[in-house]
Amino acid sequence: MKNVEILLDDPKKAVIEVSKPIIVATFIESIYSLVDSIWVSGLGADALAAVGASFPILISIYAVSWGLSIGISSGIARRVGAKNKEEADKVANHAIILALIAGILYIIAVYPNLDTLFSLMGTYGDCKSLAIKYSSILVLGTVIFTICDALYGIFRGEGNTKIVMIASVIGTLTNIILDPIFIYMLNLGISGASYATLIAIIISLLILAYELFIKKSCYVTVKLSKFKPDLKIIADLIRVGIPSALIEITVAVSFFIMTSIIMMVGDSRGLAVYTGALRITEFGFIPMLGLASGATSVIGATYGARSFEKLKTAYFYTIKIGVLMEIIIVALIMLLSPILAYLFTYTKTSMGIHEELVKALRIVPLYLLFTPFILTTSAMFQGIGKGEKSLIISIFRSLICHISYAYLFAVILGLGMFGIYSGLVVGEFTAGIFAFLFGVLAIKALIKSK
């Protein structure tokens, strides 16, 4: 198939061709994330803060589904590179079953404990009740997220990212349309945003399922009726999937701790500003995430084919494109910060944070300049099936660098919210240097071992 040929061709061309649809999809998703927050912010600062407080919960859902999805992409890509279709088919079958089990286990573990989790984060009053209302609906729909991302992983693994883009964009546009209808017209408030998200994910899932099971446009063949557990495949998916999931969980834990630090030096107002700044900054982060996602498939295929020089080319080219992209995005966000801030301060209940949000948008986006080194290196390790090394990078980045610098600047040095923003940037810079050196040494070792 053409998408498989692209994966095994020129690595620079492959990175661009595989990543383009994912970048488009993730860019549209970032627009949704922003629009979602804009509609919610119309309910007041407490509602926007509630979405921010829910971030660790949402990230943990994302961790389970996306972590498994990365494991699936890597597993299939490596087998495509090795030209072993039978094993790729087995990975796809295991993917769907494991996604179902993971989703059910998550619901059982998290849903009964939401109240306790938000209390531990230091949220209280209206902010806490709104956060529970917003996140509980999404938690109950976790199985939908996990199965949908498993199918995304199957298509990405074979380089068929056009289908990924179509399903994602249609789902996202549906979400954007449904948000104001559910939140305001149906008077569901913050719960309406959650219902809109679930319906959108279901639509994306149906599109992917149609392509895989009915149209059969996929390179791999999925026949669940012939599923037989294979411990070797399960172990392979777990080796990449669990560290990938833990990477997202470290981000959630980091935000959990960061929320506590923010509440120490500020209040729900400070959290609302931080949340707004992050949502706008996602415009820069999420396209890079799409580029790294494409790189995972390309690097996985080159690794499976044992073409380590191509792997090296794909790695450095992805970083180069990522840095150039981030420079442009950061410049635009900082230049347009007074205008962008109005996206979250357009009502009487939220206009009081406009000036603070503008200040945040002139500092926070700077961390994006160092993100390509981190995400590309993490994608490289995931692609070659060494997810535990990606986890090491994430722990160093989120739990050591971000938290340590934020606490140092905000609390110990008494810089308040400015310290939070500065800590994020300095932490990303430090983690970027570490990740890049780690990646370069790993590639040298691969080339030497051949």
UniProtKB/Swiss-Prot annotation:
- Quote the subcellular location field of this record: Cell membrane
Q: Which GO terms describe its molecular function?
A: antiporter activity; xenobiotic transmembrane transporter activity
Q: Which GO terms describe its cellular component?
A: plasma membrane
Does this entry carry the keyword Transferase? Answer: no
Topologically, how does it sit relative to the membrane? Multi-pass membrane protein
Q: What is its main location?
A: membrane
Under InterPro entries, the record lists: MATE_fam, MdtK-like, Membrane_Transporter-Flippase
Record keywords: Cell membrane, Membrane, Transmembrane, Transmembrane helix, Transport
Q: Please, which domain of life does this record's source organism belong to? A: Archaea
The membrane spanning regions, by residue number, are: 22-42, 48-68, 91-111, 135-155, 163-183, 188-208, 245-265, 283-303, 321-341, 363-383, 400-420, 423-443
Q: Which family does it belong to?
A: Belongs to the multi antimicrobial extrusion (MATE) (TC 2.A.66.1) family.
| NCBIfam families per UniProt | matE
What protein name applies here? Uncharacterized transporter MJ0709
The opening ranks of the lineage are:
Archaea, Methanobacteriati, Methanobacteriota, Methanomada group, Methanococci
